[in-house]
Amino acid sequence: MHILKKPDFSDPKLRAKLAKGMGHNYYGEPAWPNDLLYIFPVVILGTFACLVGLAVLDPAMLGDKADPFATPLEILPEWYLYPVFQILRVVPNKLLGIALQTLVPLGLMLIPFIESVNKYQNPFRRPIAMAFFLFGTVITIYLGIGACLPIDKSLTLGLF
């Protein structure tokens, strides 16, 4: 039992369509040789030239030697954990800090149910979701910047 039906080349209608060139994609610029032979190598060589240029002009410097007896005053996590670190650092009760972090995914899961009557996929036509995500982005950036500052200036970002 065959899954695919093989074309019947003895059919005159099919032969007429194939003679006219129907069934083949002839519009636009062909991928061979234009893209594969000329454009791709230019992009690859350009990327390689940028990497070599950056390596020559701005080489990665080695930092200070590791000293296990000299620890910094405050150890910071990786940059993508700054907002979470700031929440745990500022909230007085650590259990409350963890509860605040669990509210983020729960709030994200709630958005489709809040705005279920909106049938549009365009984000600019979904004001509740856009407001929610913009507010979350601003708060995340605010917490990330605050995590880089000392604890006494972290909430006001040193502005007040």
Curated annotation (Swiss-Prot):
InterPro entries: Cyt_b/b6_C, Cyt_b/b6_C_sf, Cyt_b6/f_cplx_suIV, Cytochrome_b_C_euk/bac. Component of the cytochrome b6-f complex, which mediates electron transfer between photosystem II (PSII) and photosystem I (PSI), cyclic electron flow around PSI, and state transitions. Gene3D superfamilies: plastocyanin oxidoreductase (1.10.287.980), Single helix bin (1.20.5.510). It is found in: Cellular thylakoid membrane. PROSITE patterns: CYTB_CTER. This is Cytochrome b6-f complex subunit 4. Belongs to the cytochrome b family. PetD subfamily. Pfam families: Cytochrom_B_C. Keywords: Electron transport, Membrane, Photosynthesis, Thylakoid, Transmembrane, Transmembrane helix, Transport. One of its GO terms (cellular component) is plasma membrane-derived thylakoid membrane. GO terms for molecular function: electron transporter, transferring electrons within cytochrome b6/f complex of photosystem II activity; electron transporter, transferring electrons within the cyclic electron transport pathway of photosynthesis activity; ubiquinol-cytochrome-c reductase activity. It is a multi-pass membrane protein. The 4 large subunits of the cytochrome b6-f complex are cytochrome b6, subunit IV (17 kDa polypeptide, PetD), cytochrome f and the Rieske protein, while the 4 small subunits are PetG, PetL, PetM and PetN. The complex functions as a dimer. GO terms for biological process: photosynthetic electron transport chain. The chain crosses the membrane at residues 36-56, 95-115, 128-148. Its main location: membrane.
